[in-house]
Amino acid sequence: ALKKAGIEVTVASNSGESIQTVTGDKDWASKVNADSRLADAKASDYDLLVIPGGTVNADTLRIDEDGRRLVKEFATAGKPVGAICHGPWVLIDADVAKGKTMTSYISIRPDLENAGVSWVDKELFRCPGNGWVLLTSRNPNDLPAFAKALVDEIS
C-alpha cells in the first residue's frame, strides 16, 4: 500500500538478509528482501517506522538491541510509528509503550496493560500522546485500514 501510494519503502532486518514470513505463525510463506540492517538505520533518515506483526518476527525484533533502539529513536524524535498484531510487543521492550493507548492482537493485551498501556479493541487506533503518533491495528483482517492510516499519516 505504501509503495502503491508512491512512498519509498526501506525494509531493514537484524542481519540485513531477507526476512522469512509465516502464515498463522506456523506455515512458511514468502521471503521479504531487506534493503539494510537495523544497525545502520537511523530515525533521522525516515518519516515513518512500521513494526510488522506475527509472533515470530515481533519476538525477534523485541529482543534485538538495534530494533529497540530504532523504535525509541522514532518516539524520541516525535516521528510516527505503526504496529500491527504482535508488533506492539516491541514498544514494551523499547520502553515507549507506557502511557499510550493502542490496540493489538488480543493475546498480548495483558502484556501491554502490564506495561502501562490503555488497550482498546478497534480495527485501527491513532494515539498522538507522549509527543509522537502511534498507529496500531489488531490483526491481518485490519490491514486495509492500517495501510490507509499509514499512508494518510505521512502524505
Q: What do these predicted regions represent?
A:
Residues 105:
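Active-site-adjacent substrate-recognition loops and nearby beta-strands
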